[in-house]
Curated annotation (Swiss-Prot):
Gene: pdxJ
GO biological process: pyridoxine biosynthetic process
CDD domains in the record: PNPsynthase
The protein, known as: Pyridoxine 5'-phosphate synthase
Pfam family of the protein (one): PdxJ
Key words, A-Z: Cytoplasm, Pyridoxine biosynthesis, Transferase
SUPFAM superfamilies for this protein: Pyridoxine 5'-phosphate synthase
Role: Catalyzes the complicated ring closure reaction between the two acyclic compounds 1-deoxy-D-xylulose-5-phosphate (DXP) and 3-amino-2-oxopropyl phosphate (1-amino-acetone-3-phosphate or AAP) to form pyridoxine 5'-phosphate (PNP) and inorganic phosphate.
Native organism taxonomy: Bacteria, Bacillati, Cyanobacteriota, Cyanophyceae, Nostocales
Site feature: Transition state stabilizer: E151
Amino acid sequence: MPTLGVNIDHIATIRQARRTVEPDPVAAAVLAELAGADGITVHLREDRRHIQDRDVRILRQTVRSHLNLEMAATEEMLAIALDIKPDYVTLVPEKREEVTTEGGLDIIGQIARIGEIVDKLQSASIPVSLFIDAEPAQIEASVKVQAQFIELHTGQYAEAKDETNRHRELAILAKGCQQAIQAGLRVNAGHGLTYWNVYPVAALPGMEELNIGHTIISRAALVGIERAVREMKQAIRGNGA
């Protein structure tokens, strides 16, 4: 079964709603790890709508599992990553007007630029993952830029309105996962996964890690983050929430 990366962005969302100091994402990360999180994920957005630079710097010093920094492919974010040196970076698309990441990164349309950023990060011993849709051409492009990982965008699967569409989207993810592994890429997945839909994705052969945030933080508001993380670990194993 894949490991669990807990995205704590929405702890920071609650904090930033009042521009105060709590809840602290750093404290949330500690509790998540104590409950069994295998990694901590944060997205430092260009508009700093939730996670702040301070959070990433302190998390780099305190996270005991691994820190996955999601970021846009910009010079500003590249400089921050090279300075902080997270355990790995996931390059994601980003629009200021979006509520959350809306789709996968277009590697094909900016292959030279992405390749340059991947090279600079990996030359600094920072592994790179590319958040992409499970499209054959995007997977091929990810190989060309020499990324070590991809993270398959599971949004279409998660948002499927019926079982027929859900099975179709799962088949697309399965095919993409297989293609990527055969090409030498390591495969993670995430976006929109919940306690109720995570297991079929977790069961895909070769899947290494699932990055999950909103559903865990939503559950944590009711039962606490430690229980919410433990329940997600169970769901990944097919034991339900």
